[in-house]
Amino acid sequence: ATHEVHMLNKGESGAMVFEPAFIRAEPGDVINFIPTDKSHNVEAIKEILPEGVETFKSKINEAYALTVTEPGLYGVKCTPHFGMGMVGLVQVGDAPENLDAAQTAKMPKKARERMDAELAQVN
């Protein structure tokens, strides 16, 4: 399956957001990050990646297609707006093994608040 995530200056949950911020996917799915508004990118939060998955970082203003291959949680951030809480989460498969890592990863306060809200949707 293919999923779309828009990178926005303003969305339903406030300023500087990925929308949707939480996606449920299966191994092999593609997540398309679309720079709907300018000045955004998508970068892996290296503490929130399944084992064996390489980090990734897109260029500002460019679309990026992430193919999720391994089960677990994939945390993403917008590099320039991480401090403003621009984070997203992709859950691949069930019962992610790296949930603890996602819950304890150090990040700016606003990013942590939004990540916690996204983690509340994990099942």
Curated annotation (Swiss-Prot):
Pfam families: Copper-bind. Residues 5-93 form the Plastocyanin-like domain. Keywords: Copper, Electron transport, Metal-binding, Periplasm, Transport. One of its GO terms (molecular function) is electron transfer activity. InterPro entries: Amicyanin/Pseudoazurin, BlueCu_1, BlueCu_1_BS, Copper_blue_Plastocyanin, Cupredoxin, Pseudoazurin. Residues 103-123 are annotated as: Disordered. Binds 1 copper ion per subunit. Its main location: periplasm. It is found in: Periplasm. GO terms for cellular component: periplasmic space. Disulfide bonds: none annotated. This soluble electron transfer copper protein is required for the inactivation of copper-containing nitrite reductase in the presence of oxygen. This is Pseudoazurin. It comes from Paracoccus denitrificans.
